[in-house]
């Protein structure tokens, strides 16, 4: 599934961008609403639920709070470094546990 995108602001605060509609790729076509916002010096993080649901040996999920805490430490990093850092965080969390869901994410930043 697609969780709400996270808009991380330079001051460390964040906003969840809640949207409606079906999961991408399920239907051949559908009507959707468009919106605009100024990214400014913020960071936009889009991800699938497999990121926050990724579990370790103790069956503890990675969780939204941990994801936001990680993103707060990355506000001055390039998107490629954020992605590689998050992959490392996820690997350290799940260790050798098999994952049953995709972990897909996208970082947008000026």
Predicted regions and their residues:
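Conserved subregion of the PPM/PP2C metallophosphatase catalytic domain
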Residues: 1-110
